[in-house]
Amino acid sequence: MYKLVLIRHGESTWNKENRFTGWVDVDLTEQGNNEAQQAGVLLKESGYTFDIAYTSVLKRAIRTLWHVQDKMDLMYLPVVHSWRLNERHYGALSGLNKAETAAKFGDEQVLVWRRSYDTPPPALEPTDDRAPYNDPRYAKVPREQLPLTECLKDTVARVLPLWNESIAPAIKSGRKVVIAAHGNSIRALVKYLDNISDDDIVGLNIPNGVPLVYELDEDLKPIKHYYLGDQEAIAKAQAAVAKQGKAG
């Protein structure tokens, strides 16, 4: 049996302000830093250790991983940074307040943009300052692979090559893997691992800073999964994530 640990970054400044963040590189809040540190303490106290880590190229996930490594005394851990683990790109919604957007377009439309599987928000213009084309962290990524908006289906399509080519082989070789990423890149992995339907994935919410453990068989099929920590607090955090896109 193999174990895989997934962690969504701690609360970011734009999580706190209820904004669509996507590929915008915002940092953690004080609470977010604390959540990440607590995740590291919890993992260490629960007897976990790791051989390799994966994260995105966005600082809120990178810093979350740093805190986990620090609290586990694993600062030497090899780390793979990949744009493929970035948050889903929210296109022209990037930076907008979720409740204000819901008041303008309606709760139902915003829920479709946030949570449907295959409906992306309106795209950025290629000349928009928020477009990834001139960002040095994507200099080696072919332009045609860089999104101007994404739905979850698009996010799954870009995450899976990293899973198939790097993460899954690492797990099968016996390496203990931790992934510090984002709500939607983790939803993409969970959808794939648990074979969740396009309709049911709409209801899946990933809380900030809580380790999600997958126990996998020899074919990397899930045996079971569970969050580490206070289960009542985790359920409240998931409900709060679900509520973010509503006008009220």
UniProtKB/Swiss-Prot annotation:
The catalysed reaction is: (2R)-2-phosphoglycerate = (2R)-3-phosphoglycerate
Pathway, per Swiss-Prot/TrEMBL? Carbohydrate degradation; glycolysis; pyruvate from D-glyceraldehyde 3-phosphate: step 3/5
Keywords from the named record? Gluconeogenesis, Glycolysis, Isomerase
Positions marked as site (Transition state stabilizer): 182
The question of whether Isomerase is a record keyword is answered with yes
Keyword set includes Ion transport: no
Q: Which SUPFAM superfamilies match?
A: Phosphoglycerate mutase-like (SSF53254)
Q: Name the family.
A: Belongs to the phosphoglycerate mutase family. BPG-dependent PGAM subfamily.
User: Function of this protein?
Assistant: Catalyzes the interconversion of 2-phosphoglycerate and 3-phosphoglycerate.
- What quaternary structure, including any partners, is listed in this protein's UniProt entry? Homodimer.
The record ties this protein, via NCBIfam families, to: pgm_1, PRK14115.1
Question: Per its record, how is this protein called by name?
Answer: 2,3-bisphosphoglycerate-dependent phosphoglycerate mutase
- What lineage is on file? Bacteria, Pseudomonadati, Pseudomonadota, Betaproteobacteria, Burkholderiales
Gene name on record?
gpmA
